[in-house]
Design a protein with these regions (language model features):
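Mature, structured domains enriched in cysteine- and short glycine motifs
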Residues: 2, 9-232
Length: 232
């Protein structure tokens, strides 16, 4: 039986956030929601995309190990692909979830070439344009660049930039809070959506969460999918 993306996400949400006594009593969710700071958090919140970091890095008890990735292949996937059903945090992958694509990009995840081939090809072509390459980069080439840009040791690598140079969908940090750029507006990121719109300042330097090459891809015209709260 095919389950559409919204319903499939509901099933995963229920699996992770409701214990055996029923929906009125919440259990501790899995630590699998990704923030723009790369962090893996445990909260009951729906999102638009799932993904992984190259394999499994959780225990049989469905808790995180000391690692936060399995390989450099950090990808962002759609929720429903060919009606596949998965046991979340089963034998093979540590599934992760994102509020939306700008969030995934800020954390350094690129579009998946299997379930999001068209988006991945567009992303690679915009990468080629931005870096003036002779051909679009292959996935491992992008993964090597992004791995260096998204992390410093095991922590998030921040990049200092002028806020006027940032494209839409880029993320910047203000007082340890993530804000997304949308035109002349800053949108405060939360696990449940964007809140607290405020005017975008000008002529200041900020700590940018989105990796530099992804900033270039966004500037070249790649259009990520926003959470609906960004339009409200």
């Amino acid at each position: 039986m095919r389950i559409d993306g919204e319903r499939q996400l509901d099933i995963w949400f229920e699996f992770q956030c409701v214990d055996a006594t029923g929906p009125s009593r919440l259990a501790v969710p899995l630590q699998n929601r990704v923030s723009p700071f790369v962090e893996l958090c445990a909260f009951c919140a729906r999102g638009l995309f799932m993904g992984n970091r190259g394999g499994r890095f959780h225990s049989d008890a469905k808790t995180l190990t000391a690692r936060r990735w399995a390989s450099r292949q950090w990808i962002c996937c759609i929720l429903d692909f060919k009606s596949r059903r998965r046991d979340v945090w089963g034998r093979f992958y540590t599934e992760l979830f994102f509020l939306d694509e700008p969030t995934a990009l800020a954390a350094g995840h690129r579009p998946c070439f299997e379930c999001r081939r068209k988006d991945a090809q567009t992303f690679a072509e915009k990468w080629r344009e931005a870096r003036r390459l002779n051909r679009p980069p292959h996935a491992p080439e992008m993964d090597d660049v992004l791995h260096h840009e998204r992390l410093r040791g095991g922590a998030k690598r921040l990049h200092r930039r002028n806020i006027d140079d940032l494209p839409d969908a880029a993320f910047a940090a203000f007082d340890q809070t993530a804000f997304a750029i949308q035109g002349d507006t800053l949108l405060r990121w939360t696990p449940n959506g964007y809140h607290s719109r405020k005017p975008r300042p000008h002529r200041i330097s900020v700590d940018v969460l989105t990796p530099p090459t992804i900033l270039a891809v966004l500037s070249a015209g790649y259009k990520p999918r926003w959470h609906q709260s960004a339009k409200e």
